[in-house]
Structure formats: structure tokens, C-alpha cells
């Protein structure tokens, strides 16, 4: 048996004897996770970052003005992975458990790779992590320099650093976020388009409101009427910008799969709610005031349509 296989076997044997505290069970309940997801991002929150088949734990160091990006500090529950540049939290770490943090490895990553919220680190310990300082009063210590065999256990550290580096490179692929003024202008243009479609094209209010959210998807004849009546192409594009209240909270995988499945099954369907949901996922942004309800309501419409 290889060394790694032997370690895994011992780990499984240990975990089989571990009794998970009731507080941890409650913290991982679907209801508690949903409650956390409804909160806006904030420094001190602990999350699981997932991208492709890899994952790691992080604590949010700061939230950017562009809500699609956050700065995070990597963490680990593996106490054997401590290094000289790490901090060891003997209490109050990930879900209150002993944990390692690497403040020097802080990176900007896309909000969308934050997958599962794991609660908060208290203010005192978070301040120590943010300032990369040990604090014996809070059981936060500097990582040891050598392991029992005289080697630096850096493999885990390097693996996490490489993973977060790959995540951080995705920030360069984000498109420029529409300004608040442009989004507000877009909402005003939507109202004008809606009024035009009702008065000049005989649409019902509900149809006109839906069409005004995606005017470029109107049929050729109606589109020409819009353009000849004084609307510019740029106006139509502005009308399709998401309003502030619909910047999405987070990419919920199960909902994303539903939307993608609906789009694949209905490739010719220009349903504005499908487009809206897809654009929301593309932005993967959290608004500071957390309009989760508005966004979730639009997604629910897509799900209802998909299942009926």
C-alpha cells in the first residue's frame, strides 16, 4: 500500500469515529445555507470556492466596487499544512474548527466561484488575518517552520495558491460593468418603448412590458417601427441592461442548470425571462443592498415555465 493510500485509509478510520457536533449539522442545513446566501457579501465571511473539479476554503478580505470581484484569503482545515507564512487558528476558524490561513496569498477572484457559505470568522480573529498578525489571546499563532521530519509542508499551500491564481485570471475576462447611470437610462427607455408598443403596435401591457426588456428580439416589422419613430440602436441596447435590482446574488448551480436546459430545449424561444436569467448569470454580481428577492422572482418564472 502506498503512503498516500495508507494516509487516506487512516483518515477514513478517524472520520468514522468523529461525532459531528449538532451546531455544525445545523450550520450545514439547507435552510441555514439559504439564509446565508441571501446576505450580501462582507469581509469575514468564509466560503467554499469551487471551479471545475477543484475547491478550497477562503475568507473574504474585502468586497470591490465592482460586485463581481472579491479579495479572499485562502484557508484550510488541514493543520498539517501550516507553513512559516501561515496563521494557525486553534479556535474560531472554518465553522469554528481549527484552521490555517495564508494572508500573503490573498487574491482577487470572481464572485461567481464562491459556492457555499460557511459562516463568519469573529471580528478579532478576522482582524488578525487581515493584518497577518498572530494573537495568543485569541489562540492565533504563526505557523511552524519545519515539520517533524525537518521539511516544509508546502505542497498544500502551493496547490491552493495555484488554484486561486487560475481563478483570479478569470477576472480579466469580465466585461465592463454597465454604469448605474446607463442602467437607469435603460429603465427610462424601457418605459418609452413599452408605451410605444401599446399605443402604436396594439400590444397588451404585459406583452409590451416583456418586449421592452429585450427590444432587439422584436420581429423585423416592429423593430423598424421603433427605429423610424426616433429610437436609436444604442437606446435599444441600453434598454436591455439589467437594472440594479436584478444583478444576480450568486450562481446557484441548480438554477443555472435549469435555465441552460430550458434554453437548449427551446432554442427559438425569445422569452425575455430566459435572456434575463442568462444575462444575470453572466454578470454574476452582488448588489450591496442585496435585492435577492427581485432576482429570485425572475428566475422562478423561468423555472415555472420550464416545468409546465
Model regions and ranges:
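Loop/turn positions that initiate beta-strands
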Residues: 43-44, 103
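Short amphipathic recognition helices of helix-turn-helix/homeodomain-type DNA-binding modules
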Residues: 212, 227-300
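Compact nucleic-acid interaction/catalytic patches
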Residues: 48-92
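Alpha-helix N-cap/helix-start motif at helix boundaries, enriched for small hydrophobics
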Residues: 57-59, 208, 236
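Recognition helix of helix-turn-helix/homeodomain-like DNA-binding domains
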Residues: 198-229, 239-244
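Mid-protein regulatory/catalytic core that forms ligand/cofactor-binding pockets
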Residues: 301-306
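C-terminal terminal-subdomain/extension
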Residues: 1-15, 31, 92-196, 202, ...
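Compositionally biased, charged N-terminal/linker segments
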Residues: 1-35, 40, 238-240
Amino acid at each position: 500500500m502506498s503512503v498516500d493510500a495508507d494516509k487516506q485509509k487512516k483518515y477514513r478510520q478517524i472520520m468514522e469515529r468523529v461525532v459531528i457536533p449538532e451546531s455544525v449539522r445545523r450550520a450545514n442545513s439547507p435552510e441555514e445555507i439559504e439564509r446565508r446566501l441571501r446576505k450580501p457579501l462582507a469581509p469575514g465571511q468564509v466560503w467554499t470556492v469551487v471551479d471545475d473539479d477543484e475547491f478550497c476554503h477562503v475568507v473574504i478580505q474585502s468586497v470591490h466596487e465592482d460586485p463581481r470581484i472579491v479579495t479572499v484569503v485562502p484557508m484550510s482545515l488541514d493543520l498539517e499544512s501550516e507553513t512559516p507564512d501561515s496563521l494557525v487558528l486553534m479556535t474560531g476558524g472554518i465553522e469554528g474548527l481549527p484552521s490555517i490561513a495564508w494572508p500573503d496569498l490573498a487574491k482577487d477572484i470572481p464572485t461567481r466561484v464562491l459556492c457555499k457559505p460557511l459562516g463568519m470568522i469573529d471580528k478579532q480573529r478576522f482582524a488578525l488575518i487581515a493584518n497577518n498578525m498572530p494573537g495568543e489571546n485569541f489562540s492565533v499563532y504563526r505557523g511552524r517552520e519545519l515539520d517533524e521530519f525537518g521539511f516544509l509542508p508546502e505542497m498544500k499551500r502551493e496547490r491552493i495558491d495555484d488554484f486561486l491564481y487560475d481563478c483570479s485570471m478569470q477576472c480579466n475576462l469580465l466585461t465592463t460593468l454597465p454604469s448605474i447611470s446607463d442602467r437607469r437610462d435603460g429603465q427610462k427607455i424601457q418605459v418609452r418603448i413599452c408605451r410605444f408598443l401599446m399605443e402604436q403596435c396594439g400590444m397588451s401591457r404585459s406583452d409590451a412590458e416583456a418586449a421592452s426588456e429585450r427590444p432587439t428580439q422584436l420581429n423585423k416589422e416592429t423593430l423598424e417601427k421603433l427605429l423610424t419613430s426616433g429610437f436609436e440602436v444604442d437606446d435599444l441596447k441600453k434598454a436591455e441592461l439589467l437594472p440594479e435590482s436584478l444583478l444576480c446574488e450568486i450562481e446557484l448551480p441548480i438554477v443555472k442548470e435549469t435555465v441552460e436546459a430550458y434554453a437548449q430545449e427551446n432554442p427559438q424561444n425569445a422569452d425575455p425571462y430566459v435572456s434575463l436569467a442568462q444575462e444575470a448569470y453572466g454578470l454574476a454580481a452582488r448588489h450591496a443592498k442585496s435585492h435577492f428577492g427581485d432576482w429570485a422572482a425572475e428566475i422562478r418564472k423561468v423555472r415555472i415555465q420550464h416545468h409546465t
